[in-house]
Structures are given as structure tokens and as C-alpha cells.
Swiss-Prot record:
It catalyses: a quinone + NADH + H(+) = a quinol + NAD(+); a ubiquinone + NADH + H(+) = a ubiquinol + NAD(+). This is Probable NADH-ubiquinone oxidoreductase C947.15c, mitochondrial. Coiled coil: none annotated. SUPFAM superfamilies: FAD/NAD(P)-binding domain. The keyword Flavoprotein applies. InterPro entries: FAD/NAD-bd_sf, FAD/NAD-binding_dom, NDH-2, NDH2-like_C. It comes from Schizosaccharomyces pombe (strain 972 / ATCC 24843). Belongs to the NADH dehydrogenase family. Keywords: FAD, Flavoprotein, Mitochondrion, NAD, Oxidoreductase, Transit peptide, Ubiquinone. Residues 1-35 form a transit peptide. It comes from the Eukaryota. GO terms for molecular function: NADH dehydrogenase (ubiquinone) activity; NADH:ubiquinone reductase (non-electrogenic) activity; oxidoreductase activity.
Amino acid sequence: MSVSKARLQSVVRLSRTVPYSKTMVRSFHVSCAVKNSGNVPTPRNKSFFSRALEMAEVTSSLSMLGAVALFQSLRRLNNSSPKGKSGVPKKNIVVLGSGWGAVAAIKNLDPSLYNITLVSPRDHFLFTPMLPSCTVGTLRLPSITEPIVALFKGKIDPSNIHQAECTAIDTSAKKVTIRGTTEANEGKEAVIPYDTLVFAIGAGNQTFGIQGVRDHGCFLKEAGDAKKVFNRIFEILEQVRFNKDLSPEERARLLHITVVGGGPTGMEFAAEMQDFIDNDVKDMFPELQKDIHVTLIEAAPGVLPMFTKSLITYTENLFKNLNIKIMTKTVVKDVNEKNLIVQKTNPDGSKAMQEIPYGMLVWAAGITARPLTRTLMSSIPEQSGARKGLIVDEFFRVKGVPEMYAVGDCAFSGLPATAQVANQQGAWLAKNLNVEGKKFALHERIQALEKQLGEKEAPSQVAGLKQQVEQLKLEPFKYHHQGALAYVGDEKAIADLKLPFMKKMLPLQGIVGHTFWRLAYLNELISARSQFMVLIDWLKTRLFGRYDAKV
């Protein structure tokens, strides 16, 4: 594919404005055919010359992108270093979580104003938009995870980073109780005091009370989830290959991959899985390729409701061409080891129960509040009306609790539960916390001067400081929606972009989006290390196929 210089420059400019979303957006390829959504190209075999030319183009493009991404990452790293103001009184701030909201907050906090402590059950930040790519080996998990200690080197004292789970919060005494999650400190508890608390623990998987989902299904929210899916895929393929005496029914069941949830996460996994079947199973398990298939189940009337109608139609047509079956208006009622029990709404409005055999179930049907969040919602009187998360105001202050803030999926703000929202919330909160930190430092200086100089001389000395305090104002949060992206398979994607000079969303679809997506997410990857490793993974997949060793 050749792209004009002007168009490439346009794509680069757009990549700086498009964010990422948490369960929402992952990889995608975008075409300039904005309105011709029904014209879906059919996958085709490429000649050796075409593939060689494509490889050369990809190599040169990725080399250029790698240099740009490396420069940008080093620049961000330099800008995030501590300012090191000496002698300024600091408040102790505890941040719970290591996801989008927590990381954005810490990255933007001024370490000269706060002593920062981080508590998280995991020791890394996960770039969730690319997680579906790890389920089939397009990318490797280490490429999209960043160690917390390395990420905040020079900003947080390593002794203040705790791989632990917060089990209780005493909002009156301003203390959190944590329990270790590593082998070395598993089960051990500690208590950490705070002046300010940032609650950013995210959300859990919504199962609607169906126990069989947790017993037999796979989720797609954490790094370990992707590894579990990856291993399960190969277990199924090897089991069917080895056991020649399987009945036709059992063989068909094992080779049926089912996905529940028609949002971006579910759609993107289905797309990645079909790519794996079309491009890699044919080489590793050629006798199984024609039989393994993917079905996506969605309770609502349609998939991807956050996108424009033309993009939804494009995706549905593409999935049909790729042999991915979509079942809408289908509610999962129960899950056992081998079957899904669903209720299907027919075109005439009647309902019918159906049993769907499956070999692997990937559950991507939404999120729900974590137990600690639910405990807070039930124990704080001002949170009595909370359902999806803690009720916060426009400054992210938790209603009913002083000096406690909440951002991301654990907070209810009326906005979608996406990485884009959490990232903006975390950065905005940090900006306001820096204002609060400056006010605190100025008040401390004023009190010290008044104590040192006495009541007669102090007013003239502290007048300027008090004026500075008056000028420091908090700003209510303003969300800037920048678009939605989703990979839909066969090196194609969809995107609704919000551009500052346009009132309506700009819908994009198809192959050009692959370049756009890579530019956008390379720019958003949190470190030069991750950018380099992702580039290598893409190149490796292009040249040698997907990663196929279960390690």
C-alpha cells in the first residue's frame, strides 16, 4: 500500500489527537472510504513479490515510526522528572491502583509538593487497548506492560511502592489497610496513613450472577487473562489433533470459539482470533483450519453502539465475509462446562431457549464495581444512591469523605468507562491536586512567618503570599471526547474521530486505519521500551507469523 506524503502527514497530525480507551479501543485499520461502508473487500492470497514489497514498506515505515516514538518517549521522560524544590512542606498522598487513572494522576503530580505512595495488586501498568493482540501472539505481553518501579523512577521512592491489595479504608483516621499479594508478603497486612487519598482501583468483570462464567470462561481485562486465552487456544488445537477418536459432535464443540459481548473488547478479540485462524492455523494446524470458527453473542439489538451506523454496518459485513457469526438479541442465561444456555429473541418478538456447545468462552460483557468500592458505597451515608461507582463531584471529590478523590471505572461521573476518560480524569485531578499542594505549602510558610515575626511585623511580610493563595483556583473537570477506535480484522478497523474543526464525528474504515492506529498507539505507549518492543513484535508477526510457543 502506498500513501501520499500529504496523507501520511495528515495521519501523523491526527494521531496526536486520538486517545485510547480502556475496554473500548484497541488496534484498528482505517480506510479513506468513509461513506461506502457496504463495500467490504474479501481476503485474498498475496504473491511472494507482493508480500516482499509489503514487508519492505512495513520495515521502512516502522523504522521511521520507531525513531519518532523514541524521541517522543524520551521527551516525556525528561519532562516528568522531579523538580526537586527543597524546603517545601509536603503532604502524604496515597494512590490506590496502577491503571489509566492512577498512572495519569501520578505522572502529572508535582513530587516537590507530595510524598507519593502507590498501592496496587499488580507490579505493572498494562496498555489495555492492545490486550486482544496478545491473546493470539500478535504482540507479547511484556511489550505492553511497564514495571511500576521503572515507570516512576525518580518520582516515587521504591520503598513507597507496595504490591498489595487495599482491604479497608478508615476515612475518619485517614488510614488504609493493605494485604500483600506477592509470594514474599502474601497475607501480611500493613496500615498506611495519608493526608490525601486517590481511589483508582478500577472495576471487575460483570457476570450478571452466572457462576459458570467464572468457573468455565476466560475474561480479557488483565495480562494474565490474555495468557490464559492464549494457552487455552493451543490446548484445544492440540487436543483435537491428538485425539483422533473424538466424535464429530465433540470435535465440533471444541473447535467452536464463543465470545460474549459486542463492545470493542469482544469484537476485537473475535477479529484477532479470526486473523489467527486465517493466517497461522493454516500453517500450524492445517487439518483444523476449515473447522475452527468464531461466534460472537450480544444481548442488545446491535454491536458497537458507540460507533456511527455506517461503521457498524461495515463491521457486520466484514465479519460475515470473514465467517465470524454474530448473534444479537441473545441473552446468556447459564454456562456449564460444555454449553451456553441462551435466550434468543426472534424477529417476530418471540423468545426461544437454545443450547450452544463451545470449546472456549471469552466473556467481555461489561464491568461492575469491585468489593472494596461496594463496601464504601454501602458504608458512607452520602453514597447511598451509588450503583456503578463512588459518587464524585466535578473535582473528583468523593461525596461524604474529606480528602478522598476517585477517578476511572471506580467512580461514577456519568461518562463511559473507558481508558480515554480515566486518563483525562487522572491528569485533571493531578492538576488540581498540585494547586492544593501549593496552597498547603504557602499556608505553611505564612504560619511560619507569623510565628517568627509576630503579629505586628507579619502582615506586611505575608501579604504577597496570601495574594498568591487567593490566585490559586481549582478547575472543574471538562471531558474532551477525541474519538473511538476498534480493530475489526483482516488488517482493517473502524474509527469515529472528533476533530476540533468539525461538529460531527469523522468516520473512517478499512486498511489505511492500520497505519493510523499504529501511529496513534505508538504515540500513546507509555515508554520508549514498550514502543520498541511493539514495533519488533509487529515486524516479527509480519515476517514469521504469530508467536506460537506457550511460555
